[in-house]
Regions:
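Glycine- and acidic
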Residues: 122-123, 179-188, 228-234, 269-280, ...
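C-terminal, non-catalytic "cap/extension" segments appended to globular domains
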Residues: 115-117, 227, 354, 362, ...
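Long, well-ordered alpha-helical segments
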Residues: 196-213, 251-255, 359-369, 390-407
């Protein structure tokens, strides 16, 4: 079924909550493990209609944040979502209270019961009103960001549409693009500062109600991180600071030599090549045709997937006024259909987001068609889900010439370099958030000062050159995740460590790398992050010394593939 044929009906919340109470009672009273397993499948399916409606509403709202109807529907789910989540948690509580609960682990693997325990530990009826307030704060941030229009080159442009100007070979054009963006954020400075302060206070209040010191503790439970915690993440960040950042300084020196910009400022960093960055082929249809060919050549599984996605028009990837920034994949369970949202801006990032979100969507497509995997276990934790997307960016490389033509080698270098350099920024975002939630009374200026300290730690090569907004340490405010989903961002780093290993493997044996990837994908959400890495034969980045060799291999490859 094509996306525009999918019908939306606002769900009956009272009926859903009653169904949840019924399922909870059945789970508590299930007489044996077999009955409990059947009920687990049943409760997973019970939320399909609600989740489909919620995701349809969110798709339509983010495609046009100015549409009053979809804004009202989004408000409905913002208001009612916490009650539905809490009802789901009560079902989990009933499963956990049943003496036969170990049958779920035997049937579905380690993440099923561990995930329910995290769900119970992360939710509380006393936080429902706070959750509703948080949802409203996030929606307001999305309105500010999604409604951004700036004047440049005689045009009214959205933030994503500034992308090509930021990559222009003329430094004055690049500077003007960044200043236009900065002007918008500076104009909304007071509200953005206030919103973030309210978000920190709100989430910390939720954490304290539930017995946690602050939200940095609760977030690990809510993110359903299984088998590791803040200490492992701190060790990971330390390895990045000690073993990756020194290598990145070499990489940035190579970039400066390659571009001829001896002392690059922040506005010069998007320039990776003297004659300009790689450009994908123009035109929506041409790109979609190339993507179809690429996925047909990659594997039979991806061929079936891309045909389903394109034939059913499950992409909205072109930028336009009123459309929310960013990109995502979401699922429409009732139709067993993934959906991909993006904002193309005629830069190489268009291919990044296409292959990235197709990685998410491919995993969802595979999991939804495996009858043994309950809906609740179709997707793993986010640090694992991002492996699907980031590794897909690399594993499609043999066919990137279909999208880049003569710029293919440039894109290969840009993509590998950007992915490697990203590790530092991702760790910076994560450490910043730990500081913010552990020190909630910091003033806006103090928050920005902390960000600038972390810039020196993780990205010492950056020179803001008195750039408005960024130069005062407020650049973090344009990072959607910091407002919308705190502590999510480190997941990209953990998955990048897996993706870089897939990349290095694919250089010597692409078939083996793909088969490892497919094994990982097929486990869906039934295994933890470390278990999934072990399934694919990859190193776990929490272990001391696990990153150093990978960092050296990446630096060597980049040095040997300068264009």
């Amino acid at each position: 079924m094509k996306f525009n044929e999918m019908t939306y009906t606002r769900p009956d919340i009272d009926a859903l909550l009653a169904r949840c109470r019924e399922l909870g009672a059945k789970a508590a009273a299930a007489p044996d493990g077999d009955a409990l397993v059947r009920l687990y499948y049943e409760q997973s399916e019970a939320f399909a209609e609600y989740n489909t409606a919620a995701n349809l509403a969110n798709i339509h709202y983010t495609c046009d944040t100015r549409d009053a109807y979809w804004k009202a529907e989004q408000d409905f789910f913002d208001a009612n979502g916490p009650a539905v989540t809490n009802a789901s948690v009560e079902i989990s509580r009933a499963f956990l209270a049943n003496p036969h609960v170990d049958a779920l682990t035997e049937k579905f693997g380690t993440t099923c019961v561990a995930g329910m325990k995290n769900a119970v530990l992360s939710m509380d009826d006393r936080t429902v009103e706070l959750q509703q307030q948080f949802n409203a704060l996030v929606s307001r941030y999305q309105q500010i960001y999604g409604g951004a229009l700036v004047e440049l080159d005689g045009k009214q442009l959205t933030i994503p549409q500034l992308g090509p100007y930021k990559e222009d070979l003329d430094p004055a054009v690049r500077r003007a693009a960044y200043e236009a963006e900065a002007g918008y954020f500076d104009a909304h400075r007071a509200e953005l500062d206030e919103l973030y302060g309210q978000i920190v206070q709100n989430l910390n209040a939720q954490a304290r109600v539930m017995g946690y010191h602050d939200y940095s503790e609760l977030s690990y439970v809510r993110m359903n991180r299984i088998g590791y915690g803040p200490e492992e993440i701190r060790k990971f960040r330390d390895q990045v600071a000690n073993d990756v950042v020194p290598q990145l300084q070499k990489v940035m020196a190579l970039r400066a030599k390659r571009t001829g910009i001896a002392h690059p400022a922040f506005t010069d960093l998007p320039i990776l090549f003297r004659d300009g960055n790689p450009k994908p082929i123009p035109g929506y249809k041409a790109r979609m045709d190339a993507a179809r060919t690429m996925y047909h050549k990659l594997s039979p599984e991806t061929a079936e997937f891309i045909d389903f996605m394109q034939d059913n028009e499950l992409f909205d990837v072109e930028s336009r006024p009123g459309k929310m920034s960013g990109g995502y994949m979401t699922s429409l369970p009732s139709y067993k259909a993934p959906f991909i949202f993006a904002n193309w801006n005629d830069t190489s990032g268009d291919v990044d987001v296409l292959t990235h979100e197709c990685g998410h969507a491919f995993e969802g497509y595979v999991a939804e068609r495996d009858p043994a995997i309950p809906a609740d276990l179709e997707c793993p934790g986010m640090e694992s889900a991002e492996i699907h997307s980031m590794a897909m960016e690399f594993l499609t490389a043999p066919w990137h010439h279909l999208l880049f033509g003569r710029d293919t080698d440039k894109y290969a270098l840009l993509h590998a370099e950007d992915s490697f350099v990203f590790l530092a920024y991702g760790c910076e975002v994560d450490e910043f958030q730990h500081i913010m939630y552990q020190n909630p009374d910091l003033t806006p200026d103090e928050r920005n000062a902390e960000w600038l300290k972390l810039e020196k730690k993780y990205r010492p090569w950056i020179d803001f050159d008195n750039l408005p907004f960024y130069g005062r340490g407020a650049g973090w405010q344009r990072q959607l995740h910091i407002y919308e989903c705190p502590f999510y961002y480190i997941d990209y780093c953990l998955s990048t460590m897996a993706a870089l290993q897939f990349f290095l493997l694919s250089l010597t044996d692409h078939k083996d790398a793909w088969e490892r990837y497919l094994r990982l994908v097929r486990r869906a959400g039934t295994a933890s992050y470390t278990e999934l890495l072990e399934t694919a034969g990859l190193k776990v980045p929490f272990e001391e010394g696990s990153i150093k060799g990978i960092a050296q291999q990446m630096t060597d490859w980049l040095e040997n593939h300068q264009v």
